[in-house]
């Protein structure tokens, strides 16, 4: 038995080593971003200042053709400087959050399991459920490739930086997919998390609701990377292949729209099996589409003469496509929240209990506010929330996952007494007052 426990212990220590390396690379990425944004750090330029729409000849720096016969070039469409810096910082923060999550998981797993082959095997299973070793490797690779792209952008080596960022797209996509699924089918994942409820409540809180939060953060991260990578493709096409300005814009926006729609569909079909409350991917897609729309509006305003010459209808089509992606993201966000509430309502889970409690508190607050102002009580559907169960502060519904339904309570009533003369006897007659004695 001791010989069987030794490989499990080796696997556990290797996972701990991977967590340490991953946390170190995530921290190094954050330090690199801070240094690349500091003027006195030694880097020549600010990495997030990728494009400049001033009227000047950029033939030496690269860019898209504006007037090929005159040698005039202009930069391709890209995000604004604060947006680029914010997206990169969010990537570093999410990777650091995953590293902190893994450290907390390692501490909890170690405290609640000690000695024996079964304990060692259970520790490895929980470690894989927290973050698979392959996901740690992909996350470290994502941090390293983004760091390389930031350094190249600081030196304004645009073609190589764009190619590096496009290569950076693959590791985060694989990392998010493997981290969210934990390498398990949806049914097995739900069963593994549910089994921790009785065996290890502390691990269940971390690997259940806590991991659901991390899945939302990771989904939002991938949405932002999907919004940045197509614009990097436009930079590569404009500077490396010498395409026109309109061609680079149309190519970048088209790739983003297709990738965003595919990502939203896969999120609803695949990732929703692992956590029902999943607004992160749709919200991240909405943010990415909005940021690209703001950047494209400024871009078309600054270079309106060139855009009208090359493609008069390009601006309207780009804005229409981005608006469609944003509306689709909003629709998918609402759909996911509605389906999540219906799912938890059907299961009678704790999440639906919290939602119902919040709704009841809001209804009580509205009722008190209206009564303090002397307003009439609500009618119709709004008044349905203000029933006895809502107005009572002492009653609190408790919802547990897969809990059996409660039997209906029958109110106790006092037995009715028939109204009759016997039940209500007449009072005794009053005695006459004593006579006065003279």
Swiss-Prot record:
Q: Which Pfam families match?
A: Herpes_glycop (PF01528)
Q: According to its UniProt record, how is this protein modified after translation?
A: N-glycosylated. It is not O-glycosylated.
Q: Which domain of life is it from?
A: Viruses
Name any GO cellular component annotation: membrane
Q: Does the keyword Glycoprotein apply?
A: yes
- Enumerate composition-biased segments (Pro residues): 425-438
**Ranges per topology, Virion surface:** 35-88, 154-158, 234-248, 298-317
Q: Where are the transmembrane segments?
A: 14-34, 89-109, 133-153, 159-179, 213-233, 249-269, 277-297, 318-338
Membrane topology reported for the UniProt record: Multi-pass membrane protein
Q: Where in the cell is it found?
A: Virion membrane; Host Golgi apparatus, Host trans-Golgi network; Host endosome membrane; Host nucleus inner membrane
What are the alphabetically sorted keywords of the record?
A: Disulfide bond, Glycoprotein, Host endosome, Host Golgi apparatus, Host membrane, Host nucleus, Membrane, Transmembrane, Transmembrane helix, Viral envelope protein, Virion
Intravirion compartment segments? 1-13, 110-132, 180-212, 270-276, 339-438
Sequence segments annotated as region (Disordered): 395-438
Assembly mode: Interacts (via N-terminus) with gN (via N-terminus). The gM-gN heterodimer forms the gCII complex.
Q: Give the protein's function.
A: Envelope glycoprotein important for virion assembly and egress. Plays a role in the correct incorporation of gH-gL into virion membrane. Directs the glycoprotein N (gN) to the host trans-Golgi network.
Instruction: Please report which protein family the annotation says this sequence is part of.
Output: Belongs to the herpesviridae glycoprotein M family.
Give the protein name, as stated in the record. Envelope glycoprotein M
Taxonomic classification: Viruses, Duplodnaviria, Heunggongvirae, Peploviricota, Herviviricetes
């Amino acid at each position: 038995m001791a010989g069987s426990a030794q490989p499990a212990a080796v696997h556990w220590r290797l996972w701990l080593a991977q967590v340490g390396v991953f946390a170190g690379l995530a921290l190094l990425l954050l330090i690199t971003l801070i240094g690349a944004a500091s003027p006195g750090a030694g880097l020549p330029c600010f990495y997030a200042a990728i494009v400049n729409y001033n009227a000047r000849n950029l033939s030496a720096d690269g860019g898209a053709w504006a007037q090929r016969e005159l040698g005039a070039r202009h930069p391709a469409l890209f995000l604004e400087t604060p947006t680029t810096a914010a997206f990169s910082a969010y990537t570093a923060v999410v990777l650091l959050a995953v590293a902190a999550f893994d450290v907390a998981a390692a501490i909890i797993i170690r405290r609640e399991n000690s000695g024996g082959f079964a304990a060692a095997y259970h520790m490895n299973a929980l470690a894989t459920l927290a973050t698979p070793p392959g996901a740690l490797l992909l996350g470290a690779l994502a941090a390293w490739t983004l760091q390389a792209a930031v350094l190249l952008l600081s030196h304004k080596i645009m073609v190589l930086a764009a190619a590096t960022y496009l290569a950076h797209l693959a590791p985060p996509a694989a990392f998010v997919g493997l981290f969210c699924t934990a390498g398990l089918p949806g049914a097995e994942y739900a069963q593994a998390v549910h089994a921790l409820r009785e065996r290890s409540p502390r691990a269940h809180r971390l690997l259940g609701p806590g991991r659901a939060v991390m899945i939302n953060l990771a989904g939002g991260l991938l949405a932002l990377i999907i919004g940045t990578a197509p614009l990097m493709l436009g930079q590569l096409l404009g500077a490396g292949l010498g395409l026109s300005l309109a061609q680079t814009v149309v190519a970048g926006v088209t790739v983003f729209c297709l990738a965003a729609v595919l990502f939203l569909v896969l999120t609803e079909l695949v990732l929703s099996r692992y956590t029902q409350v999943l607004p992160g991917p749709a919200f991240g897609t909405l943010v990415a589409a909005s940021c690209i729309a703001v950047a494209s509006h400024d871009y078309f305003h600054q270079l309106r003469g060139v855009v009208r010459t090359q493609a008069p209808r390009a601006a309207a089509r780009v804005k229409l496509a981005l608006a469609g992606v944003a509306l689709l993201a909003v629709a998918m966000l609402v759909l996911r929240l509605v389906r999540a509430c219906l799912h938890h309502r059907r299961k009678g889970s704790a999440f639906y209990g919290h939602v119902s409690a919040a709704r009841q508190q809001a209804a009580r607050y509205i009722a008190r506010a209206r009564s303090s102002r002397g307003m009439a009580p609500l009618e119709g559907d709004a008044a349905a929330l203000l029933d006895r169960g809502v107005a009572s502060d002492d009653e609190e519904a408790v919802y547990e996952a897969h809990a059996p339904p409660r039997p209906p309570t029958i109110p106790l009533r006092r037995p009715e007494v028939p109204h009759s003369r016997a039940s209500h006897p007449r009072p005794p007659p009053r005695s006459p007052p004593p006579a006065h004695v003279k």
